C-alpha cells in the first residue's frame, strides 16, 4: 500500500518536473488551468 502510493507520487512528480507537457492528464489539466486563468484575468480587466 505504501509502496504503491509512493510509486504513484514519484511517477507524477517525475513527469511534472521533467516534461511538464508530455503527460496527457497533466497537459490537459495544465491547459485548462492556464486557459481559465487567462479568461479570468481578461474578465476581471473587462469588469473593471
From Swiss-Prot:
Basic residues bias (residue ranges): 30-48
Protein name: Small, acid-soluble spore protein P
HAMAP family assigned to the protein according to its UniProt record, in alphabetical order: SspP
Membership in a protein family: Belongs to the SspP family.
Keywords: Sporulation
Region of interest called Disordered, as start-end residue ranges on this chain: 1-48
Any Gene Ontology biological process: asexual sporulation
Induction data: Expressed only in the forespore compartment of sporulating cells. Expression is sigma G-dependent.
